[in-house]
Structure formats: structure tokens, C-alpha cells
């Protein structure tokens, strides 16, 4: 019974780290990346639609993103959505494709992005700690119900703590790498 609680908690922690990684992909570093547009929604015939479903997005150069809409009539809507998303990007529309040049990041902007990365990291750690708390609560209920001994409870809570420490270290490592990527000139 206790093993199931640990397994379930570990899976939830893994998902929290994966969600954090996806969230970081949308934080702009110095290089162009198609993932920065993942959260951009275009009002396409009245329905909010992700840009990735409306256009082919390529990265021909390190600091350039090219968006080729499948439907040329949607090019203006895509451009408006990118501007509205407030990503600090200036798309240029030549009628058939949208080009987004990524300017070099200023020192001030780099520091702002590092703060964002740290905030996301803290949110991920809180999520992991919440999973730990829930797992420990579940184990305590099992012990109260007489399904495990106090020694078993102590052992399982130590196991959950080890998993928590492992996943928090993963989040710290991912955050450190992203910060280095951002601060790279």
C-alpha cells in the first residue's frame, strides 16, 4: 500500500518537472525558438487557435523565425496575435510570410528573464512539495487505519522525502542551465 503511494507521488513529481520544462521553453533566450509561440492564440474565424496549427514555423538562422501560414488570408491575424501576446517581438509581414528577428537581449532584459525563470522554478518546487505533503497525508491515513506500522510510516515518509529532494534538485539544475543560456552573450 505504501509503495503505491510513493509510486503515485513520484509520477506526480515527474509531471511537475515536465510541466516546468515546457514552461521554460516559452521563455526567450538569445536564440530564436519556435516554442516561444506555443502560447500564442490567433482568433481564426472566431475560434482561438494556436499559431502552430495555422502555420509552418521555421528557424532558418539563430536569430530569425519565419512563419508561413497555411492560409495566406490569416497572415494579418497571426501578426496581430503575436503583437498582442506581448513577447517583446516585432513581426514583419511581407504578404506571404511573417519574419520575426530576435534582437540581442539587453543586460536589463536578461536579468528580467532570469527572474522569470526563478519564479517558474519556485512554482515547480512548490508543486513538488505539495505532492510530498499529499503523499505523507495519505500514508498517515493508512497508518491511522491500521494498514501499516509506525516504522513503515517513517520509512515511507523518508522515501517520499528522498524523491522530493531528487526532483527539486532536477528543477534547480534545469533552472541553472536556462539562466546560463539567458546570460550568454
From Swiss-Prot:
Its main location: cytoplasm. SUPFAM superfamilies: Ribosome recycling factor, RRF (SSF55194). Pfam families: RRF. The keyword Nucleotide-binding does not apply. One of its GO terms (biological process) is translational termination. Gene3D superfamilies: 3.30.1360.40, Ribosome-recycling factor (1.10.132.20). GO terms for cellular component: cytoplasm. The keyword Protein biosynthesis applies. HAMAP family: RRF. Belongs to the RRF family. This is Ribosome-recycling factor.
Amino acid at each position: 500500500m505504501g509503495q503505491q503511494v510513493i509510486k503515485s507521488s513520484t509520477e506526480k513529481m515527474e509531471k511537475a518537472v515536465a510541466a516546468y520544462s515546457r514552461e521554460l521553453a516559452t521563455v526567450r533566450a538569445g536564440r530564436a525558438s519556435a516554442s516561444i509561440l506555443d502560447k500564442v492564440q490567433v482568433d481564426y474565424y472566431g475560434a482561438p487557435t494556436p499559431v502552430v496549427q495555422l502555420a509552418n514555423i521555421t528557424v532558418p538562422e539563430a536569430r530569425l523565425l519565419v512563419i508561413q501560414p497555411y492560409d495566406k488570408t490569416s497572415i494579418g491575424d497571426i501578426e496581430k496575435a503575436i503583437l498582442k501576446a506581448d513577447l517583446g517581438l516585432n513581426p514583419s509581414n511581407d504578404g506571404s510570410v511573417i519574419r520575426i528577428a530576435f534582437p540581442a537581449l539587453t543586460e536589463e532584459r536578461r536579468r528580467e528573464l532570469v527572474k522569470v525563470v526563478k519564479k517558474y522554478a519556485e512554482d515547480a518546487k512548490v508543486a513538488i512539495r505539495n505532492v510530498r505533503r499529499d503523499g505523507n497525508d495519505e500514508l498517515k491515513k493508512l497508518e491511522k487505519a491500521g494498514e501499516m506500522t509506525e516504522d513503515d510510516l517513517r520509512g515511507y515518509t523518508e522515501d517520499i522525502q528522498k524523491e522530493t529532494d531528487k526532483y527539486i534538485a532536477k528543477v534547480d539544475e534545469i533552472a541553472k542551465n536556462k539562466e546560463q543560456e539567458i546570460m550568454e552573450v
